[in-house]
């Protein structure tokens, strides 16, 4: 008797785009609030501290979460399947870093750590990978003049359509490359360090957003 092999399919919900996946903003809080939990305004869930809680400060006209290198948060939700493999994505953040080290991780959206499996927002002076790190080589992007941005607000905007990735800082295109990613299923998202617990971030985060779609920067 012929038996039909069942085709393994992801649940339909996993194949539908979420749009906004991660959305955090210090504007949701009052200055001097201590926040052990950050409610996510994208997909359902929250971020919880694994160590010390963040304190909300006001810095140069913006409310911001103050990272001192000791705060690490992880999400209660997995990275959606819509961001796996070579899927399009858009990432936006407002960051201020008083003293920019070589490698500091603001947010690691992935828990895998093989080549091209990372989407990691960094804020470092490393010219090869100091803005976005995919655990590639050519595929990563840095900014040679990053040190000049110390103590200033940086509007970081990164968009990838499945082929070309553009990286903007304060509206200036600092990288544009033809790349391919191999993002694997990821158990959680990490704030303040990478998933391996390295590259502590010391600075201020006003807001962070991640979409599972390509949204070119509007002029």
Specify the residue positions occupied by each region the protein language model found:
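Short, small-residue-biased leader/transition segments that mark boundaries at the very start
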Residues: 1-2
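Extracellular glycan-recognition modules
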Residues: 17-21, 25-50, 54-62, 66-130, ...
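Core-facing hydrophobic residues within beta-strands of well-ordered domains
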Residues: 20-21, 153, 186, 205
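Flexible glycan-contacting loops in extracellular carbohydrate-active proteins
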Residues: 59, 176-205
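Short, aromatic/His-centered strand-loop micro-motif at the edge of beta-sheets
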Residues: 77, 130-155
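Surface-exposed coil/turn segments at beta-strand junctions on protein surfaces, enriched
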Residues: 84-86, 148-151, 182-184
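Localized edge beta-strand/strand-to-loop motifs within extracellular or lumenal beta-rich domains
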Residues: 152-166
């Amino acid at each position: 008797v012929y038996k039909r092999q069942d085709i393994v399919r992801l649940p339909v919900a996993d194949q539908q785009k979420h749009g906004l996946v991660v959305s955090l903003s210090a504007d949701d809080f009052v200055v001097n609030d201590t926040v052990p939990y950050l409610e996510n305004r994208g997909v359902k869930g929250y971020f919880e501290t694994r160590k010390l809680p963040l304190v909300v400060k006001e810095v140069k006209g913006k409310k911001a979460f103050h990272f001192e290198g000791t705060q690490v948060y992880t999400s209660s939700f997995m990275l959606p399947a819509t961001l796996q493999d070579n899927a399009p994505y858009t990432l936006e953040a407002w960051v201020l870093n008083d003293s920019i080290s070589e490698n500091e991780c603001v947010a690691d959206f992935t828990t895998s750590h093989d080549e091209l499996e990372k989407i990691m927002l960094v804020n470092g002076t490393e010219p090869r990978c100091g803005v976005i790190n995919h655990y590639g080589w050519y595929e990563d992007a840095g900014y040679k003049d990053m040190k000049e941005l110390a103590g200033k607000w940086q509007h970081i905007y990164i968009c990838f359509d499945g082929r070309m990735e553009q990286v903007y800082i304060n509206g200036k295109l600092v990288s544009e490359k033809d790349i391919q990613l191999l993002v694997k299923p990821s158990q959680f998202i990490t704030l303040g360090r990478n998933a391996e617990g390295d590259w502590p971030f010391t600075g201020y985060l006003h807001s962070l957003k991640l979409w599972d779609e390509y949204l070119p920067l509007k002029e």
